[in-house]
Amino acid sequence: KKKIKKVIFISTMAVYGQPKTRIVNEKTKTSKTTNYASIKLKQENLLKKFIKNYQCQITILRLPGVVGRNSNKNFLSQIALSIKKNKIITFGNPESYFNNLIFSEDLAKIIFKISKNNKKYKYNVYNLGSSKPEKLGKIVNIICRFFRFKNKVVIRKTHKSFYINIKKFEKDYFKLNTTLSSLNKFNKSNSK
């Protein structure tokens, strides 16, 4: 029988709900605002209990919007889809900073690196995102320019936004790609 040595669990930034702080880190209070967030938190807690009885390493990765070719369940993918269908783009908080994305290939590298680590911990949570947050309005403008979008862009009032503190992961592993680098990869992957 082989023993399980490592578990890498894919969770979500949705576990924070609508944070009251502008910057979210691993110590930010979680919130079960959606069924999805509630299920992910229950799974995280089950894994925390699991390690009490077993000798293995558990790493929780709380993911932002994962972008790449054919991604569709996140904010940036919805904008790209609206552009391709020549629909009006609507978004809020153009002056807020945004790094709530990670390119799918970069995520694969992260998982591989964690699977090969020799670090001494039993349970660890990491928020992922891109480094060097950029203003959301700038990000939307870059996407619109890349796809030569000339239709209407509507800015609406929305709840306060946040950006992700990724310092813990970068301290323990490696520097993550910048927001602009991830956005560039996303644009190129969706131009085909």
Regions found by a protein language model. Give the residues of each.
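Active-site pre-Tyr helix/loop in NAD(P)-dependent dehydrogenases
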Residues: 12-13, 29, 35, 63-69, ...
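Hydrophobic positions on the long internal alpha-helix
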Residues: 1, 46-47, 110, 114
